[in-house]
Regions:
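C-terminal helix-rich "cap/oligomerization" subdomain common to oxidoreductases
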Residues: 1-5, 29, 74-76, 112, ...
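N-terminal Rossmann-like dinucleotide-binding module
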Residues: 1-54
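Contiguous beta-strand/loop segments that form the cofactor/metal-binding neighborhood of enzyme cores
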Residues: 192-284, 320-328, 332
Length: 365
């Protein structure tokens, strides 16, 4: 570790595709407390290209070589979900602190094993549930804790995203439910995690998980591929606080209406709206206290923004907020949310929702 910064190595740092060029690279570039120190891709030529593009001193085409040779404070696993488990296991076995994209594993068992090993080795962990670092949700959580709308009675979450019918060849691998990158785990997982962050965890849940579009058109090849991955999730549940919850998240063909999260309390209402996924896009917060005729937009206090103004808006912003938090944790040897334990809790909820859908029974948590 440098005097004022942590050294980060990223596995999955390609220039042309993936999450690194869209979020991590532009985020870290503007973070004074985080140094992009090493890249690893699956091929030597792409690793060198990434190092040159990002201005990173070390390039590797084998992650084990990077783990053995690079002087790092944390390793980030930023690859497709099916590779999370293998790579994260190797990082943990090497004794490195770790950041892994969400979902932590392709299933609950993988998440349990990764969380157990991280605890056994006493390593610091973070998972890319970036809504937990988003200023709007941090502020919303605090408003709820301060009883801004009194006792929360119920909440409703809706998210509809377009484009389920057709995908480029690089994304049709997500058709297989076993690979773990589905509407249930990713869009729903991110959105329900933000809800739980603000309102608390579920005591019980009933779910309906289904695939409404059983074939995708693969662009460029012009072929149709069979799909087992779910695209529509509907749940009803009760939080440990007693609040009633309903949620409906779908990947639909056309004209998705975006995201809307409504919270109803004894003294008023809070609403979050977004045209995009709230974890990566811009959102607005509205409030309606008892006696008001209309909802009024709330400005998010600047104290919730922890990163420089030069960090780009969109996906890089909340990722930068996470890196700021993780840097603080590494420097102080303190684990902050969202950790592997946070991710494991979310995996357990997702598993319960799937079990409820499969069996037609309410699941207790």
């Amino acid at each position: 570790m440098g005097l004022n910064s942590i050294r980060v190595g990223i596995i999955g740092a390609n220039v042309g595709y993936g999450w690194t060029p869209r979020s991590h690279a532009p985020a870290i570039a503007e973070m004074p407390g985080v140094e992009f120190a090493a890249v690893c891709t699956s091929r030597e030529e792409t690793a060198k290209q990434s190092a040159d593009t990002y201005g990173v001193p070390l390039a590797f085409s084998n992650h084990k070589e990077m783990l053995n040779k690079a002087d790092l404070d944390v390793v980030a696993v930023v690859v497709r979900v099916p590779k999370h488990y293998e790579l994260a296991m190797d990082v943990l076995k090497s004794g490195q602190n770790i950041y892994t994209e969400w979902p932590l594993g392709a299933n609950l068992k993988e998440a349990e094993e990764l969380t157990a090993l991280a605890k056994e080795k006493n390593l610091l962990t973070m998972v890319g549930l970036q809504s937990r670092a988003a200023p709007i949700f941090m502020y919303l959580r605090d408003l709820i804790r301060e009883n801004y709308i009194g006792v929360v009675l119920s909440a409703s979450l809706r998210q509809f995203s377009s484009g389920v019918l057709s995908r480029p060849p690089g994304r049709t691998w997500q058709k297989d439910v076993e690979l773990g990158a589905t509407t249930l785990t990713i869009p729903f997982g991110h959105s329900i995690d933000a809800l739980c962050m603000c309102l608390g965890e579920f005591a019980s849940v009933s779910g309906n998980v289904s695939t409404k579009v059983p074939q995708w058109h693969e662009q460029e090849t012009n072929r149709m591929v069979e799909v087992s991955s779910p695209d529509t999730i509907m749940i009803n549940g009760t939080l440990k606080s007693g609040a009633a919850i309903s949620a409906h998240v779908s990947a639909i063909p056309h004209h998705g209406s975006g995201y809307r999260f409504e919270i109803y309390g004894t003294e008023g209402t809070l609403v979050v709206t977004s045209n995009d996924a709230p974890s990566t896009g811009s959102s607005k917060l509205w409030q309606g206290k008892a006696g008001q005729s209309d909802l009024v937009e709330l400005e998010i206090p600047k104290r919730y923004t922890k990163v420089p103004s030069s960090v780009p808006a969109g996906p890089p912003f909340n990722i930068a907020q996470l890196w700021d938090r993780f840097a603080e944790g590494i420097k102080s040897n303190t684990e902050f949310e969202p950790s592997f334990s946070t991710a494991l809790t979310r995996h357990k909820l997702i598993d319960a929702i799937q079990k409820s859908s499969d069996t037609g029974t309410t699941q207790e948590l």
